[in-house]
From Swiss-Prot:
This is NAD(P)H-quinone oxidoreductase subunit K, chloroplastic. PANTHER family: NADH DEHYDROGENASE, NADH DEHYDROGENASE [UBIQUINONE] IRON-SULFUR PROTEIN 7, MITOCHONDRIAL. Its cofactor is [4Fe-4S] cluster. The keyword Metal-binding applies. One of its GO terms (molecular function) is iron ion binding. PROSITE patterns: COMPLEX1_20K. The lineage of its organism: Eukaryota, Viridiplantae, Streptophyta, Embryophyta, Bryophyta. Its EC number is 7.1.1.-. NDH shuttles electrons from NAD(P)H:plastoquinone, via FMN and iron-sulfur (Fe-S) centers, to quinones in the photosynthetic chain and possibly in a chloroplast respiratory chain. The immediate electron acceptor for the enzyme in this species is believed to be plastoquinone. Couples the redox reaction to proton translocation, and thus conserves the redox energy in a proton gradient. The keyword Protein biosynthesis does not apply. Disulfide bonds: none annotated. One of its GO terms (biological process) is photosynthesis, light reaction. It comes from the Eukaryota. It is found in: Plastid, Chloroplast thylakoid membrane.
């Protein structure tokens, strides 16, 4: 067996490359005696790292912007590398991306979905129609001019529609925002008051589903009113019957006269 003279040098290079590299300026460990599996960190940094690495968005698309968001699921952009897992239930999501136009009828459903999400939760307003109402903001009576009138927004993503690269950039900015949060900022997770503009006057009414569906008629209408309506209704029916009978008798007489002739 013949060995090359460079074999020993190659073996030494491999053993040297397998040694852990430690930065002399800002070491990752307290000292070199600690094992490589132990990393010193803080509670805030650990929780922030866990949350920003596992953002689960809620699929909420109402317009053409959702097509651009759906393209992120493919292999070309592959947003799974950021830890994003699409969810269909708001109770399992901590991020909602409002992609598309928000109408007046969709506004209560959107607020309900947001309130069902666990804390902490984040919102990305995607597209011009979501941020300002878009082309429907001038003469439309059924479009909400900005989703921030309903729920608090963390990241605004303009465009009509935004490109998938812009969505990834918005997610990266949101990850940086989460990384800078502290545990003392928990109070900001509380839902604040939503201020509505004069253009959108929402009238909050009580719930109509009272469960009392088998009410008697006399509870709504008094007996006197019910009898008065019957008194006015019965003579009309009698008169109609009399006129119908008279018409039939006249027709019979005409038929008999024609037969005699």
């Amino acid at each position: 067996m013949v060995l090359n003279s460079n074999y020993d040098n190659y073996k030494n290079k491999i053993t040297n490359s397998m040694k852990p590299l430690i930065n002399s300026v800002n070491p990752a460990f307290s000292n070199q005696e600690n094992p490589n599996s132990v990393i010193l960190t803080t509670f805030n940094d650990f929780t922030n790292w866990a949350r920003l690495s596992s953002l689960w968005p809620l699929l909420y698309g109402t317009s053409c912007c959702f097509i651009e968001f759906a393209s992120l699921i493919g292999s070309r952009f592959d947003f799974d590398r950021y830890g994003l897992v699409p969810r269909s239930s708001p109770r399992q999501a901590d991020l909602i991306i409002t992609a598309g136009t928000v109408t007046m009828k969709m506004a209560p459903s959107l607020v309900r979905l947001y309130e069902q999400m666990p804390e902490p939760k984040y919102v990305i307003a995607m597209g011009a129609c979501t941020i300002t109402g878009g082309m429907f903001s001038t003469d439309s009576y059924s479009t909400v001019r900005g989703v921030d009138k309903l729920i608090p927004v963390d990241i605004y993503l303009p465009g009509c529609p935004p490109k998938p690269e812009a969505i990834i950039d918005a997610i990266i900015k949101l990850r940086k925002k989460i990384a800078q949060e502290t545990y003392k900022d928990k109070s900001k997770f509380q839902q604040g008051n939503r201020y509505l503009t004069l253009n959108h006057k929402f009238h909050f009414v009580s719930n109509i589903n009272t469960g009392q569906y088998n009410k008697q008629l006399d509870t709504k209408i008094s007996n006197s009113q019910f009898n008065s309506t019957l008194d006015t209704f019965i003579p009309i029916k009698k008169n109609e019957n009399l006129t119908f009978l008279l018409k039939n008798e006249d027709n019979k007489e005409n038929i008999e006269n024609k037969s005699k002739d």
